[in-house]
């Protein structure tokens, strides 16, 4: 049974999509192994987004991710990583297909604004292990 890390980002929490996102996970047959409400800080975001810290948009990303609470979860199931990523949709909301979480609910960014794409999911088993350790063994 595969596990992955996922997060409902501040825009998803603020806009009231927690129940919808969790319902989609449960309807797909995945198990929720852990769930917490957190307020992210710059330190944890630097570890989570380590490959992005030198990018010019990183401060905007930190501002967005610290703008409100996030919901962090560990979910499990058969092929959960690839299936969850498909369910989320394309990272850029304008490219996300209808029927995906981002396609149905995310908003394309304005200039100088972070991409408010509602959810995050690990992209590989290695990323899942690393992100679970960062957020739950903090």
UniProtKB/Swiss-Prot annotation:
Domain of life of the native organism: Bacteria
EC identifiers of the protein: 2.7.4.6
SMART domains: NDK (SM00562)
A GO biological process held by the record: GTP biosynthetic process
Annotated Gene Ontology cellular component terms: cytoplasm
Cofactor names: Mg(2+)
Catalytic activity: a 2'-deoxyribonucleoside 5'-diphosphate + ATP = a 2'-deoxyribonucleoside 5'-triphosphate + ADP; a ribonucleoside 5'-diphosphate + ATP = a ribonucleoside 5'-triphosphate + ADP
Active site: 120
Main location: cytoplasm
Keyword entries, A-Z: ATP-binding, Cytoplasm, Kinase, Magnesium, Metal-binding, Nucleotide metabolism, Nucleotide-binding, Phosphoprotein, Transferase
Pfam families on file: NDK
Residue numbers binding ATP: 9, 57, 85, 91, 102, 112
An example Gene Ontology molecular-function term: ATP binding
Cellular compartments annotated: Cytoplasm
Cited function: Major role in the synthesis of nucleoside triphosphates other than ATP. The ATP gamma phosphate is transferred to the NDP beta phosphate via a ping-pong mechanism, using a phosphorylated active-site intermediate.
Subunit description: Homotetramer.
Protein name: Nucleoside diphosphate kinase
Annotated source species: Streptococcus agalactiae serotype III (strain NEM316)
